[in-house]
A protein has these predicted regions:
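Surface-exposed, hydrophilic segments of mature proteins
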Residues: 26-264
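Membrane engagement elements in two modes
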Residues: 2-38
Length: 264
């Protein structure tokens, strides 16, 4: 079967919230690609990068996806990133641009049709894979998953499902392991995505692992999105990120709004 090109658009948005006193309402900060509105002392910036000729550079949208050639778990470069062909860089970190320490939580959403989520969570069955962040110290590469970014609780993924624009998404989220000082930036949250080598398109249908992929109504391969979202809360008065986020946003907070199910 002939492999075909698939285009993907990876988008990001972020929201921050600050608690500045018992008698005051929550303040928010919103940042996107077109405008910025800031009130209060918490201000975060969602940083997206990719590899360039002179190091990491700002991320460019609308990447073309091909089935990966090689292994994303194989040989790495100086950034701790795979050298496998057709790997798509998506290096995400969060900077605290405010004046106060802040707890940070980040969310990564992937179309449910391309992800083996609830209840099995079998990564080997994902059509579109994503890699956790990495860091390189003294030529040693380590994952930020479970260390700097806490993706699980009680050995379960921080996870829920929601719908955006008529497309179902599996959402994974993680808390940064400590409050981030003013002016500091987290380690990498995620590092990139890649299309499984088994992916193919034939006669107007899509397949992976020898099976047809069941796509949502209205699916458009030229406008696939993996939204990234970050929230932050002033650290003062809280012992950890989970406590801060629950107090600021409430339990089971869906940053994109709408109905969310299969929380764990």
């Amino acid at each position: 079967m002939k492999k075909k090109i698939t285009a993907i658009s990876l988008c990001a948005a972020l929201l921050a919230i600050a608690i500045v006193g018992a008698s005051l309402a929550y303040f928010t900060d919103t940042d996107n690609k077109t405008n910025t509105f800031t009130v209060g002392n918490v201000d975060i910036d969602l940083i997206e990068q990719q590899r360039g000729k002179e190091g990491l550079e700002p991320f460019q949208q609308n990447k073309k996806l091909y089935p990966i050639v090689g292994s994303a778990q194989g040989e790495k470069d100086q950034y701790g990133m795979p050298i496998a062909k057709n790997y798509v860089d998506k290096v995400v970190a969060v900077q605290n641009k405010g004046s106060e320490k802040a707890y940070i939580r980040a969310y990564f959403a992937i179309p449910s049709a391309l992800d083996d989520g609830y209840e099995n969570f079998t990564a080997g069955q994902n059509v579109l894979h994503f890699n956790f962040g990495k860091k390189v110290e003294n030529d040693t590469i380590t994952s930020t998953e479970g260390k700097e970014w806490i993706w699980k609780h009680d050995d379960k993924w921080n996870y829920f499902e929601t719908t955006m624009g008529g497309i179902r998404y599996n959402v994974y989220y993680a808390d940064y392991y400590q409050a981030v000082d003013a002016g500091e930036t987290t380690e990498q949250f995620v590092q990139g995505v890649y299309l499984d080598k088994s992916f193919d398109r034939k006669d107007g249908k899509c397949y992976a692992f020898g099976k047809e992929i069941k796509l949502d109504d209205g699916w458009n391969w030229n406008a696939v999105q993996c939204p990234v979202f970050a929230v932050a809360c002033q650290a003062e008065g809280f012992d950890n990120a989970s406590e801060a986020m629950t107090a600021a946003f409430g339990a089971n907070y869906n940053p994109w709004g709408g109905t969310a199910t299969n929380w764990q």
